[in-house]
Amino acid sequence: MGGSSRAGLAVQTRLAPPGPKTRTRPTNAKGRAMLAVDVVSTGRLRAPGLAGWLQVTAPKKARGAVTVALVPDTRIRQLNARYRGKNSATDVLSFAAGEPGFLGEVVIASGVARRQARQAGHAVQVELRVLALHGLLHLLGYDHERDDGRMARVERRLRRKGGLREGLIERGRQ
């Protein structure tokens, strides 16, 4: 399983579109804060419907913008080595932005996602949902390595809400 970092990533992946340094907080038609999701890919893997699914499934406290980046395994290996000291590809990494209105980036390894989907016996689009949700929870401050099961409980509830049967934390226990 991947991990999280507090380092800003937009500069590191160069995936986020250039824009102003200050971001406005996304709101719905009623002016209520909401989650805005942008999905970008540097390869052939696409994720139709992932942004909308994550917006509907995310916990209520998820407010602001998040970028979900689908990258080659080689790129996530570089990021994993740089930020976590692990010279291997992982499935998902989360990088909190630390700026108002922007939660951060969830980076998913396309090849790892394909392999894990095959092993789990489901479509790669399902795997992308599992990974994106897991990464988003890290952006919101959850840490399954230190929180005595709190993240696992939240992930399980949201996963059911979004129609998924198992999440990364349960898989990691097998």
Please provide the spans of the model-predicted regions:
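An acidic/histidine-cluster motif and surrounding catalytic segment
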Residues: 1-128, 137-174
